[in-house]
Structures are given as C-alpha cells and as structure tokens.
Amino acid sequence: NYKDRYMLTGTFRADGSSRFTNDKWGYFPSIAAAWTVTNEKFMKNQKLFSEIKIRASYGLIGNQDITPYSTLGLMGSTSFNYGTDTNYTGYWASGLATPDLTWEKVKQLDLGIDLGFFDNRLTVSLDYYDKKTSDALLQQTAANYLGGTKYWVNAGEVSNKGLDISISGRILQNKE
C-alpha cells in the first residue's frame, strides 16, 4: 500500500500431494493490484465520486480432491467354490494405475471497479471474471472385461466468464 492510492500483493504456493504418483508438486502464483483514483491530487476538487477504485487480479489454484492411493494399480480378490468344498481365489483389477495424473488447475482473471457516491452511502461494484479450469479431475469407469473399476483421469477443460454487479445503499446512517 503506497499513500493509500496504490496497492499490490502477490503470493506463490508450492503444494505437494501424496495423492499423485509421479507429479506430486503443484505451483500456484497469484497477483493483485488496485488503484484508488479518488486519492489522487487531480480528483480532490470533484464532488461526484466519494470513491473510485480500479482492481485487477490473476491467480492459479489447484485441486487434488481424489481418493488416496487411487492412482495405484490395485488388485482385489474373492473366493469361489464352484459347488465343492474347495475354495479357489480369483483376482481382478480393483484399481487401474494412473501414474501420470496431475493437479487440476484453475486460472482466474478478475477486473473490477468500485464507485462510491454521497459519502459512500451508495456504492456500485462491477466485476468481470474469466475462469478457466484445465486438467479437470474426472472419474471414469473401465470396461467390464477390465474389472469395471473406476479410475481418475485428467480430462477436459471448463471456462466460465461473467459480470457481477453489486449496488448497495445505506439509507439510514448514524453519525458516530
């Protein structure tokens, strides 16, 4: 924060997860900046706005919400006796190996402006967002001849874009 006009923040995360076999680490940076225009000298004599703040942020986050050990190839067993006193053990693939499964990644850009009127008794916020999910974690089912088991894959991308508008008013306000 510089002179209550310019704000800048950033983070960097390195997250490790034992839920993934080969690609355990995900790296997730983010940055945000804001400019309070009404705190500039050239805005001091205007009376219309009590606040103008322009905001922008960009970040990357990860998702590792899968069942532990689900990237390993696992075997299941059961016993059959075929109508006799002797039990025979049968095996099947109860979990297919997916060693290259990796973090689901979400990239998001936000651009916004906050406007205040009448000593901030009326405020308006406009926000544009663009959110893209890649390497989405999806559980699929193997064919029956492979055991019919479920396994995780990185499949697909999702994109969301939109505009959020918020209007707030403080009709009654005590002077404190």
Please give the residue ranges for each predicted region.
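Extracellular/periplasmic, surface-exposed regions of secreted and cell-surface proteins
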Residues: N1-E176
